[in-house]
């Protein structure tokens, strides 16, 4: 029997990513990233858009692409233990930019699930071109 009140793993992980995003000091774009094992048994890393450790978290600008902050994806990838042999997937509150998408491809993450689309889908296209599974959480 299926418990219809039991939340899916996608829902749980996306809620965690949304909560992590609230750590960002950016007033417009609070972005969260969460890396988990594909079998949903381990949280491996997390990140949000913010500055380098010890530096001011005040964005240089509120204009898109000009904040000067590290993107959530990069912060999560920097903290990831690459020795873990399990396959990995990443949950994002915003689809990746092209730069972050390339970093994700190089990290050997196999699937990316995003909540909202970035201002362009160039990053999503890069992930697809590299044969990663990529999908909108809302689809």
Predicted feature residues:
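Zinc-dependent deaminase catalytic domain
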Residues: 1-139
